[in-house]
Design a protein with these regions (language model features):
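Conserved AMP-binding loop of ANL adenylate-forming enzymes
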Residues: 129-178
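Conserved pre-ATP/AMP-binding loop-to-beta segment of ANL
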Residues: 80-97
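Short, solvent-exposed loop/turn and secondary-structure capping segments
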Residues: 109-110, 158-159, 225
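Conserved adenylation A10 loop of the ANL superfamily
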Residues: 95-109
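Active-site glycine/GP-rich loop and adjacent strand/helix microenvironment
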Residues: 1-52, 59-67, 74-82, 161, ...
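Alpha-helix N-cap/helix-initiation motif
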Residues: 84-88, 109-117, 370, 374
Length: 505
């Protein structure tokens, strides 16, 4: 009997509970909110916002303000210095480091023991549960899980307190039983130098029977390419013939899909998207034929949503899950067992179903171009690129885009820097196809492009090989959960990238 067949029944039981998501979502979410408020009643935050007087969602929304990291930073700083009962009961020892705000280089997101187990590890368990449900012939546990993570460091030298990539915190605290099927060893998985880690992982894992991969697509690709270099093989399935699934998240998979098809040629390879962030684990692709993910509503996270067009208004009103509409872009607001209260995480989603609640990630609240009223979001960009690639045979590795507000001739346009894995034969044709696709996808963009009166045709600047990796490396962000910002409404990032494009880093 295989190890997978022995373990499978444990995971099957969980999938039965997920059926509540379709019929009892509001009830489940109200229960989550009640538990959150009850647990935090005697914290500093709970006392300041009169949690003892809150008995329903309406009172919660009235008494607790919508917050950003800047507004919670003072509380989090106190927690990082060892104070207890601030945003969540007890002392929080772990902090997930993520990209910063306008005022800070980095954000430090608290990860409580409750959040670690009830949210992050629950998400990993359900991910496997749904995969096994959809693939009854899977031999997932009969080999190794290659889990790619970041690194961590001591937090203010407090005993047993860590700060670093969420993935590193998860690996550090993982159930020892998981180590039986996980690779690489912890000492390698947590190396801080990504290039050394990449090489060590490739050397170790290439000699093992790897059946599944977990990580960010961009960084996993670096490991896979290095594995091919070391082994001399032409495809990953020659190295790991039993490889069957890649659990991926962190960035949109669309730009990488074709590259993975070239790397892993097995027709039996599966890809399963997850929506896990420093702030929590929010969604899973439960149906391999549907790109939308199911919102995970019983992980100790209470969800609210702000219509995207209202997100920058001081009087913006959030709606609970049961108040959302299909097809509308929303900014996510969460309250969690990690002590984040009505917290804007910066991501935007669009619901494709409300029975159960399923969604696609449409972008970031600060990752868009709206310099001329065109309201271009990441979802538009990903779809436009996919269409242009499909028509030209090109493969995009990385990209970023930003506005050119006015050039020497008084013209405004969008400027794209694109690193191609496989370049199109004619870059101008590719640019035209991308521009036309964006006009079909986004009516505001189409209106601004009308006769080029407001917005000229977009410009594409090809990036030299490894440009974006070099840019991340120059900022100390190579590896881990760091990613290239896709769109920006200013030129800060694109100008840095272009400066590096003139040399070899």
């Amino acid at each position: 009997m295989s190890l997978t067949s022995i373990i499978r029944p444990f995971f099957v039981r969980r999938t039965n509970r997920l059926e509540r998501y379709a019929t009892q979502a509001e009830e489940v979410q109200r229960q989550v909110l009640a538990r959150l408020v009850g647990r935090a009643e005697n914290t500093l935050w709970g006392k300041e916002h009169h949690y003892a007087d809150i008995s329903n969602y309406e009172q919660f929304a009235e008494k607790v303000p919508i917050s950003t990291y800047e507004e919670l930073k003072g509380y989090i700083d106190r927690m990082r210095h060892g104070e207890s009962d601030i945003l969540w009961p007890g002392t929080v020892k772990w902090y997930a480091k993520s990209s910063g705000t306008t005022n800070d280089k980095s954000k430090f997101i608290p990860v409580s023991r409750d959040g670690l187990h009830d949210t992050h590890y629950a998400g990993g368990t359900d991910c496997v549960s749904l995969y096994l449900r959809n693939n009854p012939k899977s031999r997932l546990f009969d080999g190794r899980a290659l889990i790619l993570g970041g690194s961590h460091a001591p937090n203010y030298n407090l005993p047993h307190s860590l700060v670093g990539d969420l993935s590193a915190i998860l690996i550090e605290n993982i159930n020892p039983l998981v180590n039986v099927v996980r690779t690489p060893p912890k000492r390698v998985a947590l190396l801080s130098d990504f290039e050394e880690k990449r090489d060590r992982i490739a050397e170790i894992a290439s000699k093992q029977n790897v059946t599944n991969l977990s990580g960010v697509p961009s960084w996993m690709m670096a490991v896979l390419n290095r594995t091919l270099e070391i082994t001399g093989k032409s495809s990953i399935d020659q190295v790991w013939p039993n490889l069957e699934v890649f659990f991926h998240g962190g960035v949109a998979f669309t730009p990488y899909r074709e590259q993975y098809r070239q790397l892993i040629k097995s027709e039996g390879m599966h890809y399963m998207e997850t929506y896990n962030a420093s702030e929590g684990f929010f969604g899973l692709q439960d149906d391999p034929s549907d790109v939308a993910m199911m919102l995970m509503i019983d992980y100790g996270v209470f969800f609210e949503f702000i219509p995207l067009e209202e997100v920058d208004r001081k009087d913006a009103v959030a709606v609970p899950l049961w108040g959302v509409e299909k097809g509308r872009n929303y900014a996510i607001v969460i309250s969690t067992t990690c002590g984040l209260w009505r917290y804007q995480i910066g991501d935007t989603v669009k619901f494709t179903s409300t029975n159960p609640y399923k969604f696609v990630i449409s972008g970031r609240t600060k990752s868009f171009i709206n310099a001329f009223g065109e309201e271009l979001i990441v979802d538009n960009a990903e779809k436009g690129l996919a269409e242009a690639c499909q028509k030209t045979g090109a493969v995009v590795s990385e990209y970023t885009a930003a506005p050119v507000f006015m050039d020497a001739e008084g013209r405004c346009r969008h400027q794209w820097v694109i690193e191609f894995e496989k370049a199109p034969q004619d870059l101008k044709t590719f640019a035209t196809l991308l521009d036309e696709a964006l006009q079909r996808i986004n009516s505001d963009y189409e209106a601004k492009r009308y006769k080029s009166l407001t917005l000229q045709a977009l410009e594409i600047i090809p990036a030299r090989r490894n440009l974006f990796n070099d840019w991340l490396k120059s900022r100390g962000k190579l590896g881990g959960q760091h990613k290239v910002p896709r769109l920006a409404n200013n030129r800060d990032i694109i100008d840095q990238v272009l400066a590096l494009n003139t040399n070899e880093g």
